[in-house]
Amino acid sequence: MRALHRRGARIAFYEKDLPYYAAHRDLAAPDYCDLRLYSSWDDIRTAALREAAASDIVVTASYCPDGALISDEILELDGPLHVFYDLDTPITLNLLQDKGTDYLRREQIARFDLYLSFTGGVVLHQLEREYGARLARPLYGCVDPDAYRRTAVREEFRNSLSYLGTYAPDRQQKLDELFLEPARRSADMQFVLAGPLYPNHWTWPANVRRFEHVAPAQHAALYSSSRATLNITRQEMADSGFCPSGRFFEAAACSAPILTDWWKGLDAFFDPRDELHLVRTADDVLSCLNAGDAELRAKAERARCRTLAEHTGERRADQFLGFCDEAYRRQYSPTEVTA
């Protein structure tokens, strides 16, 4: 959004004021958009629909509380381009085949002018061919290089390996193998795990430092204080492929060596041999952590250069506007599997 604002866009961002996010809000007063917090849709419905009707583009997103209900009303507006942005498309589609979601119904997909997906690859074909999406395009995560860059080490974050992520059951097996087991076998190393919702009854290795929440403004310091950082992909996302986490690019922009599991399409974003460290077992992780600093830093620097060239907010803003223009014209070529 910041990059779009720099291009002259005026952005109104509506967010439901939920208790957890209220306690950990990233920005109380962002300078690149008008933040509109609301307690219930009914409270702001009239004003929001009036503002949406006067807009060029209206975007609704996955996980928006009551999003399907809101989209029903947004989609009735004649003026704006209707866009849906899905941050977890494979998960959304699996839910639609099962119990459904409260942020999107299957029949709504065909009504959006543009369906943007945080995941690329074959899921784009699936959206168009099986769900009737008019135009499905990938809009991957990105990084703001002004906010994410190498900083001085902070002692409270200093570690040999960090992992930043919310608890998810389908990541647990990999978390145990690639993070907790290396910690158990390396009493002389310090590990940092940051993120909410981990079970209270868990017993952590003594050398794992826990942070329930690290504000985005401190992410760069955490990455810069990590000798290496770990990326773990949710299984449904990994099965689909082409699913880079935004934190992937944030860590790379901070020159943090990245250890990661493999998923289809990873090599479309980074060179797995020259820019990343692929890990499948605890032994792989320990081998990386026992490597020399020069080897770790060389790959990290190559990943940083790749990120700044291809994965910034500026690049994504250009892509977003290009996809919107494509949707306006309604003349597009078939989606490529490697998109």
Residue ranges and their predicted role:
Residues 139-142:
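Carbohydrate-associated surface elements
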Residues 71-83, 133-136, 177-181, 245-252:
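A short, gly/pro- and small-residue-rich
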Residues 53, 77, 110, 131-134, ...:
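Structured loop/turn residues at beta-strand edges in well-structured enzyme cores
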Residues 2-39, 86, 92, 134, ...:
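Catalytic binding pocket for nucleotide-activated donors in carbohydrate/polymer assembly enzymes
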Residues 2, 144-228, 238:
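Conserved catalytic-core segment of nucleotide-activated headgroup transferases in glycan assembly
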